[in-house]
Amino acid sequence: MKHKLLAMSVLAAISTQAQAFQFDTSDDWEIRWDNTVKANIMSRVEKQRRDVYEGGRGNSTTAAGLADDATLSVDRSNLGIISTRLDVLSEFDVIWKNDFGFRISGSAWYDHAYKDSDHPSDRLDTWATPSVKPGEYGDAAEDLHYFGGEILDAFVFGNWFIGDTSLGVRAGRHTIYWGNSLLATGAIAGVGGAMAPVDFMKALSVPGSEAKELFRPTAKLSTVFQVTDNLTLNAYYSFEHERYRLPETGTYFSPAEGLTEDTEFATFIGGQPFRV
């Protein structure tokens, strides 16, 4: 892990609120369209270590076989560039009388560094993506790291006041997260973790990512009922489940083969590939 951290340097990171439109409307309406542009350039500052991708003393090990594709994907040629990523986050909100409205947001990205890989063509015995040649990325890696986009939030909401109580309802793709956890694993594997899958790919490899980009919205119906000043009832029903997102197999920040659904083979002791 120490060598992995030392092997990466942030050369430049730029984030700017490129456009923030507040539309002129009547007092009852609020319409906003915000766009954030973020650019990152990263480079590895150390060359590939043989003991990392071949195991100790030059002997092949399971750990090396499962993790070699990541470090071999970027060498020190071309300044050892790991990423030249451009991100755009667009958010559109329409609110009427602060009580009703909708929100839709989406993100898009382009990273020329993931157009191809530096993985050598002579290491087929531990290559985890045989559907493409070493030196290329699979379809899943290209979609997630090279060029792509996705819808994030897409929901409607309403708030009602009933006497001294209030009821809030949201329907559609949105994020909720209840409470805190004393242990780190509780935030991931507990009730809160089940509500909002995390985009660990962005957390690990895209500096400057905000929480609203890391917690992935899912389709659900949620309510908040304020009974008294000291009592609030919350409920939700989820219509879909999303997996936690990890860096794809063969990319620089991938921790190991076999952790994503798009891994085709995992290499175990003796360098023998195993179909997953």
Language-model features, listed with the residues they occupy:
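Outer-membrane beta-barrel proteins
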Residues: 14-31, 74-80, 88-100, 140-144, 156-162, 167, ...
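Outer membrane beta-barrel
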Residues: 98-255
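Gram-negative bacterial Sec-dependent N-terminal signal peptides
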Residues: 1-20
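Glycine- and aromatic-enriched membrane insertion/assembly motifs of diderm outer-membrane
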Residues: 70-110
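Flexible glycine-rich, low-complexity coil/linker segments exposed to the extracellular/periplasmic environment
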Residues: 51-71, 260-276
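One-face residue pattern on beta-strands with alternating periodicity enriched for small/polar residues
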Residues: 32-40, 85-93, 153-155, 218-220
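Transmembrane beta-strand segments of Gram-negative outer membrane beta-barrel proteins
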Residues: 23-68, 102-106
